[in-house]
Amino acid sequence: MSDSTPTEAAVAESNTAGNEATTNSDKASPETTTTSTTEPGNTAKTAAAERMARFRALQARAKTSSDQNLKAATAESRREASDPSQLTALHRRHAIASHKILKADVEESGGDFERKRAWDWTAEESERWDKRVKKKEAARDNNAFQDYRHEAEKIYKRQLKNMPPDMERYAKDKMAAIDKAAAAGTLDIVETEDGELIAVDRAGTFYSTTDSTDFAKNKPDKEAIDRLVNDMKKAEDVAAKKRKARMAKNGEDDDVTYINDKNKQFNQKLARFYNKYTAEIRESFERGTMI
């Protein structure tokens, strides 16, 4: 009896523990079910809120883009409606009128207009302005055609004026030439007391002379070649436009049958006397029936 009593007690304890576990599991199951049904609802609400926020952001971005496009289109239409040449002429006329009014007021008060106007400029600025005006007047007086050499010189100077120097490329090529000469031993790099580096040409061969041919080794970059091609195309377009305008002015829309003005006059004289005899022959040649 004493041996069976502990076994029965253990079985009873195990049954009691099992009943408590079952009770606890039954109590916990509703909570688990409630949690599982609540989390998907919160996730759906959060996703809907995020989608609505993104939609509102897209709406605001679309409205901003529309407003910017409208402003750009309005500015473009205003810019196209205004003629730049007319605005320049208007500013010029305004400046001339202001100059005349100021001159009249000064002369009416008994003062010297040129002297008063010179107060606003320094001597160096006045000299530069006089030199510029003189150069401009000389260019205007020298506008007439003289000979082809002079015309080519004017075109060359105008092209040089429209071609700014590339100082960055110049400095790069200069440093490359100095490094090459220093590596070859023909150029010495000397450091002064201030720490400045000076290149000394002891052999006298670094700088170009009249006998130098190093310029023939220069290879232009792609941008320079493209600029040359564009300039040539512009020149051809301008020449074709002038030729077309000249032909339209003279009423010559047909084929060109002359090589210069003298030959043109001779052809016109022949046409006055012989067109009535050669009209049928020329038409036959054009149709190809003469052959």
Curated annotation (Swiss-Prot):
Subcellular location, record wording: Nucleus
GO cellular component: catalytic step 2 spliceosome; post-mRNA release spliceosomal complex; Prp19 complex
Name of the protein described by the UniProt record: Pre-mRNA-splicing factor SYF2
Organism (species): Pyricularia oryzae (strain 70-15 / ATCC MYA-4617 / FGSC 8958) (Rice blast fungus)
Gene field: SYF2
Subunit composition and interactions: Associated with the spliceosome.
Function of the protein: Involved in pre-mRNA splicing.
GO-annotated biological processes: mRNA processing; RNA splicing
InterPro entries: mRNA_splic_SYF2
UniProt superkingdom: Eukaryota
UniProt key word Nucleus: yes
